[in-house]
Curated annotation (Swiss-Prot):
NCBIfam families reported in the protein's UniProt record: gal_kin, PRK05101.1
Chief location: cytoplasm
Binding positions for Mg(2+) per the UniProt entry: S130, E162
Job of this protein: Catalyzes the transfer of the gamma-phosphate of ATP to D-galactose to form alpha-D-galactose-1-phosphate (Gal-1-P).
Transmembrane segments: none
Keywords tagged on the record: ATP-binding, Carbohydrate metabolism, Cytoplasm, Galactose metabolism, Kinase, Magnesium, Metal-binding, Nucleotide-binding, Transferase
Family affiliation: Belongs to the GHMP kinase family. GalK subfamily.
Species this protein is from: Escherichia fergusonii (strain ATCC 35469 / DSM 13698 / CCUG 18766 / IAM 14443 / JCM 21226 / LMG 7866 / NBRC 102419 / NCTC 12128 / CDC 0568-73)
Gene that produces this protein: galK
Pfam annotation, one family: GHMP_kinases_C
Keyword rRNA processing: no
Name this protein carries in UniProt: Galactokinase
Biological process (GO), any one: galactose metabolic process
Active site per the UniProt annotation: D174 (proton acceptor)
Length: 382
């Protein structure tokens, strides 16, 4: 049963009438451009064919009812006429409440809604299940009430909800690609202007995501430390963000910076340049160059930004040994575990899967999870 059929069926059973709309918003994987988003830089993600799906209908009052199919059909109810505060027991409900609350601040011309939510974006894997949920909820209200909001505004609303209501720091990339993704394309995003450019993906190339299943423990504290180090670097150059510093300016005075901060800054500057070049390489179908850029990105994350772990490095090495210069592989996401992403000719996928199955667990004691994805369409009706 598809997520659409599942949520529609549950909706009718729970609420006693049929849903009028079914909305989806996808998860994402970032092909290159890591930790550049909060430095006003460039990222190159694609939406993937794992998504949050919501069957929904407008109500003729001011109440919101939300059922979470993936959490034992837990039900949350709240009113649009009372202050929206955090739910004491259901963390999932706070993503929904946060999106609705921040949407009220932007455009309060919507009424009540019934929703049933289900999703298959792996949680805790760094594939943006939370952004997918935020964008899906925003799109539900936009579609049901014909709100004059575009994808970028729905994305910004989701980011605000996550930062201010849920209380998690995040950049804008995850919500933006979920809202604006394009089938068979990656999206080059300028995280300062929020300008986007669709970049066609070469035919016959699979987007493979492998979860190391190494439990990320440091990611929150270390993420905040990296942000502070980048801000320290920007202040040193008297610029609003590292986006505004050139590699030449950096090289001239790198010795004056704290050595750790210098390494962090170098990663951001080189990663920004790599990301812009990667978009060109992909567009030209130059998988060899894309692979080189992904390898440089991984080395920079490992050595300069210091956010990889041995398990992730091992996974990258196993994949690289199989694909050689026929594709690319690197860690993706915040770091300290999580996933790697690989662009692989479709005919090599079985060999990669076999090599990883034979070697990764033997070397690390952890079993990986392997996903073969298609670059997919952003949020909308399904």
């Amino acid at each position: 049963m598809s997520l659409k059929e599942k949520t529609q069926s549950l909706f009718a059973n729970a609420f006693g009438y049929p849903a009028t709309h079914t909305i989806q918003a996808p998860g994402r994987v970032n092909l290159i451009g890591e930790h550049t988003d909060y430095n006003d830089g460039f990222v190159l993600p694609c939406a993937i064919d794992y998504q949050t799906v919501i069957s929904c209908a407008p109500r003729d009052d001011r109440n919101v009812r939300v059922m979470a199919a993936d959490y034992e059909n837990q039900l949350d109810e709240f009113s649009l006429d009372a202050p929206i505060v955090a739910h004491e027991n259901y963390q999932w409900a706070n993503y929904v409440r946060g999106v609705v609350k921040h949407l009220q601040l932007r455009n309060n011309s919507f009424g009540g809604v019934d929703m049933v939510i289900s999703g298959n974006v792996p949680q805790g894997a760094g594939l943006s299940s939370s952004a997918s949920l935020e964008v899906a909820v925003g799109t539900v209200l936009q579609q049901l009430y014909h709100l004059p909001l575009d994808g970028a505004q729905i994305a910004l609303n989701g980011q605000e909800a996550e930062n201010q209501f849920v209380g998690c720091n995040c950049g804008i990339m995850d919500q933006l690609i979920s809202a604006l993704g394009k089938k068979n394309h990656a999206l080059l995003i300028d995280c300062r202007s929020l300008g986007t450019k669709a970049v066609s993906m070469p035919k016959g190339v699979a987007v493979v995501i492998i979860n190391s299943n190494f439990k990320r423990t440091l990611v929150g504290s270390e993420y905040n430390t990296r942000r502070e180090q980048c801000e320290t670097g920007a202040r040193f150059f008297q610029q609003p963000a590292l986006r505004d510093v050139t590699i030449e300016e950096f090289n001239a005075v790198a010795h004056e910076l704290d050595p750790i901060v210098a390494k962090r800054v170098r990663h951001i500057l080189t990663e920004n340049a790599r990301t812009v070049e990667a978009a060109s390489a992909l567009e030209q179908g130059d998988l060899k160059r894309m692979g080189e850029l992904m390898a440089e990105s991984h080395a920079s994350m490992r050595d300069d930004f210091e956010i990889t772990v041995p398990q992730i490095d091992t996974l990258v090495e196993i994949v690289k040994a199989v694909i050689g210069d026929k594709g690319g592989v690197r860690m993706t996401g915040g770091g300290f575990g999580g996933c790697i992403v690989a662009l692989i000719p479709e005919e090599l996928v079985p060999a990669v899967q076999q090599a990883v199955a034979e070697q990764y667990e033997a070397k690390t004691g952890i079993k990986e999870t392997f996903y073969v994805c298609k670059p997919s369409q952003g949020a909308g009706q399904c």
